[in-house]
């Protein structure tokens, strides 16, 4: 009887150890299979911004004169997304649409669903990169944080979003003066067009097609 009891004891202890090891393995697999940057503790609404090149002059949407920035070499802005991913506006020969958005701006809040639908419906012209910049971020203003706002709106995953610095370094480099703000940069890295305000998607499509020669 004593021998049988000892054998059962060893079996129970072995089973417990197996459960513990198995549980640890499951935790390890779960951790390695998920992006730790997506946890709320690793999301940042701001990032350090570096700018290469000269800043563009401030955009005056009320002026009938030709935008002085057209034809200028666009600065290259580098920063991080909300989860720490490195992002740069250097299109490396690809035409780029830059979209500057502020979470508290009602015009931006109306424009974002249009942009989302534009992409979902496959109406975004091919052959361009779209990069958004979340700027003007202020925890004291409504609809904060921008990361959650854009997630709720199902902002396209293929469109990277740069979290601007608290002093709007990225926005200032491109001459932002109002929201939402659009800058189209051609394949040579030159400014093709700048726009501000609520822009209809058919108008945006037409301008992009002009830029890429469609």
Give, region by region, the residue ranges found by the protein language model:
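Hydrophobic beta-strand anchors of alpha/beta hydrolase catalytic cores
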Residues: 97-98, 130, 182
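N-terminal targeting signals for export/organelle localization
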Residues: 1-74
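Thiol/disulfide oxidoreductase modules built on the thioredoxin-like
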Residues: 94, 153-157, 163-213
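Extracytoplasmic
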Residues: 69-74, 92-95, 125-128, 177
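Hydrophobic beta-strand positions
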Residues: 78-79, 100, 184
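Short active-site neighborhood of thiol/selenol oxidoreductases, capturing the structured segment around
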Residues: 86-109, 115
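A short beta-strand-turn-helix
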Residues: 75-96, 120
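Structural microenvironment flanking redox-active thiols in thiol-disulfide oxidoreductases
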Residues: 109-154, 162-172
């Amino acid at each position: 009887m004593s021998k049988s009891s000892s054998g059962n004891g060893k079996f129970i202890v072995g089973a417990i150890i197996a459960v513990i090891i198995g549980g640890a393995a499951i935790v390890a697999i779960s951790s390695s299979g998920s992006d730790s940057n997506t946890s709320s503790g690793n999301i940042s609404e701001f990032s350090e911004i570096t700018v290469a090149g000269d800043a563009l002059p401030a955009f005056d949407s009320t002026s009938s004169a030709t935008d002085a920035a057209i034809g200028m070499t666009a600065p290259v802005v580098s920063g991080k997304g909300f989860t720490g991913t490195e992002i740069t506006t250097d299109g490396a020969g690809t035409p780029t649409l830059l979209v500057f958005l502020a979470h508290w701006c009602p015009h931006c809040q109306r424009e974002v669903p249009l942009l989302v639908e534009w992409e979902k419906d496959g109406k975004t012209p091919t052959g361009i990169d779209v990069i958004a910049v979340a700027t003007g971020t202020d925890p004291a203003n409504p609809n904060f944080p921008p990361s959650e706002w854009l997630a709720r709106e199902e902002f396209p995953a293929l469109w990277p979003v740069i979290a601007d610095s608290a002093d709007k370094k990225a926005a200032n480099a491109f001459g932002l003066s109002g929201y939402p703000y659009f800058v189209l940069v051609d394949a040579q890295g030159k400014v093709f067009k700048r726009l501000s305000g609520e822009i209809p998607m058919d108008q945006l499509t037409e301008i992009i097609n002009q830029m890429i020669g469609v």
